[in-house]
Design a protein with these regions (language model features):
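Catalytic machinery of carbohydrate-active enzymes
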Residues: 1-265
């Protein structure tokens, strides 16, 4: 570890925190202190990820801010207050960045790090008590055989980058963390229609880890939860489907074990 501090700029969407987790951990070992930015809505998950690393400092944006780049006023404030620091950036902090397919590898290229370093940092800080509490509440309604499904539908806010809705045909109850999956279906007599409650919503997506690991099936779009999946133990999940046109196997080799469902074609 050297005596320099590091301001590390990377994209702030929820999934980016998992994509860039290895880079933060790497820099945490190299620098005396590492300063990263976080959207207000992601604060609980990001704080949990790094709470065991005293030299990782998280700067949280205003509650109304929802851009994937850190606010310039906070960046400038950091630069003026932190002595002996370097600024390291990835993504669109460089206006020439190529955000086409495979952008995740280019994030690491910008940092002069091999993308394979991600496989060296696959441990994340989990809160078993919170996970089990949420799991028990949900399976108390849905039962122990259920589908975990996630796309960009959310009753709390509208995502700025909407993905096509994910639909499945199954007799198993479908749990969506951010909306009643059955609320948009015409048949309100569906036996699973009234299982969901907004009380099952958590402001920390890490709370769903146990629920995901114990699900019968997983169906997700390329989103924050798909970025979380490589960190979980999914060996007992009978079916895993991701709905995307991206080359997700290059994102993480674990997706070789998934059904990759093309969308919009």
């Amino acid at each position: 570890m050297n005596d320099e501090n590091c301001i590390f700029l990377f994209h702030l969407s929820t999934g980016d925190n998992f994509t860039m987790y290895a880079a933060v951990r790497h820099f945490q070992k190299l620098y005396r202190n590492v300063y990263i930015f976080c959207l207000h809505r992601n604060r609980r998950a990001v704080i949990q990820l790094y709470e065991t690393y005293a030299n990782v400092h998280i700067i949280i944006s205003d509650e109304t801010y929802n851009n994937f780049l850190a606010p310039s006023n906070l960046i400038n404030q950091c630069k003026s207050q932190i002595k002996n620091c370097v600024v390291v950036a990835s993504g669109y902090y460089d206006s020439t960045f190529d955000g086409s397919t495979g952008f995740w590898e280019r994030f690491y290229t910008q940092l002069c790090l091999p993308y394979r370093i991600r496989y060296q940092y696959e441990d994340i800080n989990r809160n078993n008590e919170r996970e089990l509490s949420l799991y028990n509440s949900i399976v108390g309604m849905f039962g122990k055989n259920y589908i975990f499904l996630h796309d960009h539908r959310n009753i709390a806010y509208t995502h700025y980058d909407i993905r096509p809705n994910v639909r499945v045909k199954s007799d198993l109850p479908v749990f969506h963390p951010n909306i009643n999956y059955y609320s948009e279906l015409e048949n309100e007599t569906n036996p699973h229609h009234d299982l969901w409650s907004s009380e099952f919503m958590s402001d920390n997506l890490l709370d769903y880890c146990t629920l995901i690991e114990n699900s019968t099936e997983i169906h997700v779009s390329d989103s924050s939860f798909s970025c979380l999946m490589p960190f979980l133990d999914l060996k007992n999940v009978k079916r895993k489907c991701i709905y995307t046109n991206l080359d997700v196997v290059s994102y993480h080799s674990e997706f070789k074990n998934w059904e990759i469902m093309a969308v919009g074609v």
